Amino acid sequence: MAKKIAAQFRLLLPAGKATPAPPVGPALGQRGVNIMEFIKRFNAATASMGDVLVPVDVTVFADKSFTFEVRTPPASFLLKKAAKVEKGSGEPNKVTVGKVTRAQVEEIAKQKMKDLNTEDLEAAVRIIEGTARSMGIQVVD
């Protein structure tokens, strides 16, 4: 029989560098999860990812055990890194903060494919282009 799920939540953490400080400690502690066990397992699973922020879906069961699934970094994070900008535009339709090439967008789309709701690369590229547009990052050929 399957375990009873007590809680499900998502955290955005630096790969390989999770600590008991917020947001990890409070999110896990209030649900009775062993914080240090989570940190050790998460850091081991993401150590090879480098310096990126990764979303992690945590499922806590009624017996206080847990599982987690590491997802791909957010498209906005990857776009900011590719465009070499600190943050997106406050007025995306008026002010552009950076540029990315179509090849960079395709690379990001390939990396994000498993988390996007499409199997088609061209559709994935359009999704990433839309994210870039909403951040004030221009896509050039």
From Swiss-Prot:
One of the Pfam families matching this protein, by short name: Ribosomal_L11_N
PTM comment: One or more lysine residues are methylated.
Entry keyword set: Methylation, Ribonucleoprotein, Ribosomal protein, RNA-binding, rRNA-binding
Gene Ontology BP terms: translation
Chain segments annotated as coiled-coil in the UniProt record: none
SMART domains given in the database record: RL11
GO cellular component: cytosolic large ribosomal subunit
GO MF annotation terms: large ribosomal subunit rRNA binding; structural constituent of ribosome
Record-stated family: Belongs to the universal ribosomal protein uL11 family.
Quaternary structure and interacting proteins, as annotated: Part of the ribosomal stalk of the 50S ribosomal subunit. Interacts with L10 and the large rRNA to form the base of the stalk. L10 forms an elongated spine to which L12 dimers bind in a sequential fashion forming a multimeric L10(L12)X complex.
Functional note: Forms part of the ribosomal stalk which helps the ribosome interact with GTP-bound translation factors.
Name of the featured protein: Large ribosomal subunit protein uL11
